[in-house]
Every structure is written in C-alpha cells, then in structure tokens.
C-alpha cells in the first residue's frame, strides 16, 4: 500500500540534491545552488520560528517549503513548470503496493496541489505519471473539490489503465473516509461507477483498495453493502468474490450472520469443544498459547473460519474486544476432529496498552462463539508463574 503522505519522514539535504539533479537533467537552466541555498535558509528560519511555539517542522510543511522554492526557480508558466517536473520523475514502478523511497518526489506532488489547480488537463497528465512512481493522492484533492464531475470521469477512464498502480489510485483517491486525509465530500453516485469498473480486477493491490472503499461505505449503509456483496459473490467470478470477502472482513469478525451467509459459510454441528490456555498466568513480554479441539462429524468440503477474540481489560472502562484471524480451511476429507492453535504475545506497544488482570479469550468459528477460557496478566513484569500445562474449559 502507498505510504500516507503525512507519515513520510522529512527530506534531508541529500533528497534536495537529488531533486535538483533530476530537474537539471531535463532543464539545464535550473538554478541548482540558489535553490538549495534558499531551502536551507528558509528551513532554518521555519525551525527557529516553530521552536518558539514548541513545534517541529513536519514532512508536509517541509514539502511545502520546497515546493515554494520550486515556484520561484522554475519558469513562471505553470504548464511549462509542470512539464519539467513530470519529465524529471522516475520511471513508473512495477505493479507493487509499495512506494519506493523517492523522498525528492514529494515536493512535486505538493507543487501540483498548491499551484496547478487552474490547469486541469496539464495537472491530470502530471498526476497520471506521478501516481505510478510516488504518492499523488493529495495532489488530486483540489481537482476533486473544484471539478468533481470531469475529474471523476477521467478517473473512470483510468480504471482501464494497464498499470495496476493507476487503477488502484483511481479507487483510493475518492474514498470518502480515507484514514490518510480529511473526509472527502463527494456524492456517492459519483464514486460507485469507479468501484463497479474495478469489480473484476485481478490485481491484489486494486482489490484491497476497492474492498477498503466498500467497507467505508458500508459503515454508513450496511444493508446497501451486504446486498451489493451478495450480488458480487453470486457472479461466481473469483476476482469479484475476492473483493467481497475482503470488504466483509469487519462484518465477519463481528459474527454478522448475513455476511457469513453471503460467503456461503454455514454453522457447524459440533458435539464437543475444548480450548486449552498455557500458561494460565503470564508476565509482560511473555506468550500465551491457546489450543482448540473440536469433535463432531465434519464432511468433506466443510469450510471452517476461525477467529480468536481477546477481551483486554482497561482501567475503569469496558474491556477492549480485539479479534484475531485464525485460519480459513476447507476440509479435503471427512473428519471427526479438528485442532488449531494460536499464540498471543503480551508485549505492550504504542497502540496496545496492557492492563494487568484477567483476560477473557473466546473462540469463534463460522460466526458463532463455541468456546472460551481465561488467563491472567501479572502485574510484575517478567515474572513467570504456573507455566506448566494449561487447563481446559469445555463449551
């Protein structure tokens, strides 16, 4: 997946030199030394000013500073400046979800966003090339706000582009609830044609983006999403079904019966279940291992979708419910038993604060909670107690 622009690290002097060198290769009149010196001067002034307010120079501000200097050092004609900047871009990347570390490309995206919105055709051509070698999501935002109809129409045409990065871009930039940017106010009827155009796309990075987009829309209109995914699944097309499976992931984790029905995953006839947890008491930084055993008559072709649910306690609040994907299998022969395991690492980090005390573990199969157990996180980090064989709780 493309790295969100706001999370990219600030550019160093080497990146500025790379940008200047790239421009000089296509426009020899570029004042390389003046450009670099102005950036160093402006950067020092900006850092000093922000220090008074205890703020730092983030990557977006740094890119804006460089883009401002591009405006003064390139020809005053914006279309001509855009031509120079797009000509100096790296070659299009392979159809991978990862964006190479071309940090010197970021100010070009900022230049397009800040100064090129009056030149729609030239800007769209620049964005088409930029999205194949860097992050162009922010660059197109002004066009979506100022010219939504014709910009969305151009994106719809790009949905047939041979580059998967371009096709993914078409879907990603019009997400109304994208986590990497402010909410985009676009009528849903402008967005839906993009999703339908990519319905049968076979590339994983495109499928992932379409699925995320559908899931976003489903948060405000669940019945619409479920009905549409039932239609897509019913086509029998493996690509449309792959997107539907990914789009419904959140509903599957919550045990939504209709989502399981759409994916044709049926409840199991289980005679006996047992979940073993080892150890029952664990310290910070240690691991908890869980083992599930099922007994029943499972016919060949039976599909099993396993999720592990941990209820993490929180100080004075309702425990946080975290769903972990286990495994999804289809039995290749008749069976009377099924066993699976999962390991949980009890190490806290920035997005996972752990509170000592009892933790409840549930096992969910095909949308139904079929077993549960409990383990305790000790309040003395590193201490190990009762690490021998765990106990079993039958459902």
Regions found by a protein language model. Give the residues of each.
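Beta-strand-rich binding/interaction modules
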Residues: 286-295, 299-315
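Short acidic/polar inter-strand loop motif in beta-rich domains
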Residues: 348-350, 364-373
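Short beta-strand elements
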Residues: 368-385
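A beta-strand/beta-hairpin structural motif
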Residues: 290, 322-349, 377
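Short glycine/proline/serine/threonine-rich loop/turn segments at secondary-structure transition edges
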Residues: 348-358
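Surface-facing alpha-helical segments and adjacent helix-coil boundary elements at the starts of domains
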Residues: 1-259, 282-283, 300-303
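Surface beta-strand/loop "capping" patches
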Residues: 260-297
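Short beta-strand and strand-turn-strand segments in soluble, beta-rich domains
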Residues: 270-273, 315-328
């Amino acid at each position: 997946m493309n790295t969100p622009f706001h999370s990219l690290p600030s550019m160093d002097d080497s990146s500025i030199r790379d940008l200047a060198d790239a421009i000089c290769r296509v426009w020899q009149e570029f004042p390389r030394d003046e450009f670099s010196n102005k950036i160093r001067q402006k950067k020092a002034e900006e850092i000093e000013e922000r220090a008074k307010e205890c703020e730092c120079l983030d990557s977006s501000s740094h890119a804006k500073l460089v883009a401002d200097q591009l405006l003064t050092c390139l020809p005053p004609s914006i279309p001509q400046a855009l031509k120079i900047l797009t000509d100096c871009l790296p070659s299009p990347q392979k159809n991978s979800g990862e964006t190479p570390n071309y940090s010197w490309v970021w100010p070009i995206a900022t230049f397009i966003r800040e100064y090129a919105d009056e030149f729609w055709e030239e800007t769209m051509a620049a964005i088409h090339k930029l999205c194949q070698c860097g992050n162009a999501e922010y660059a197109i935002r002004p066009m979506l706000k100022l010219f939504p109809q014709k910009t969305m129409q151009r994106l719809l045409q790009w949905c047939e582009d041979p580059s998967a990065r371009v096709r993914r871009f078409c879907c990603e930039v019009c997400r109304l609830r994208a986590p990497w940017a402010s909410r985009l106010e676009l009528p849903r009827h402008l967005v839906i044609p993009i999703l339908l155009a990519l319905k049968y796309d076979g590339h994983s990075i495109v499928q992932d983006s379409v699925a995320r987009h559908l899931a976003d829309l489903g948060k405000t209109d669940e019945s619409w999403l479920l009905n549409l995914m039932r239609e897509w699944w019913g086509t029998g097309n493996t690509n449309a079904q792959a997107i539907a499976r990914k789009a419904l992931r959140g509903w599957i984790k919550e045990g939504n019966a209709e989502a399981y029905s759409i994916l044709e995953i049926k409840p199991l006839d289980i005679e006996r279940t047992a979940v073993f947890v080892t150890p029952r008491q664990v310290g910070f930084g240690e691991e908890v291992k869980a083992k599930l055993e099922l007994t029943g008559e499972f016919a060949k072709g039976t599909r099993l979708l396993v999720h592990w649910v941990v209820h993490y306690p929180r100080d004075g609040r309702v425990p946080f419910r975290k769903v972990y994907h286990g495994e999804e299998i289809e039995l290749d022969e008749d069976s009377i038993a099924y066993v699976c395991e999962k390991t949980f690492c009890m190490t806290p980090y920035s997005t996972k604060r752990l509170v000592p005390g009892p933790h409840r573990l549930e096992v969910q199969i095909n949308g139904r909670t079929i077993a549960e157990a409990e383990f305790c996180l000790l309040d003395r980090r590193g201490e190990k107690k009762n690490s021998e064989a765990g106990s079993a709780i039958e459902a």
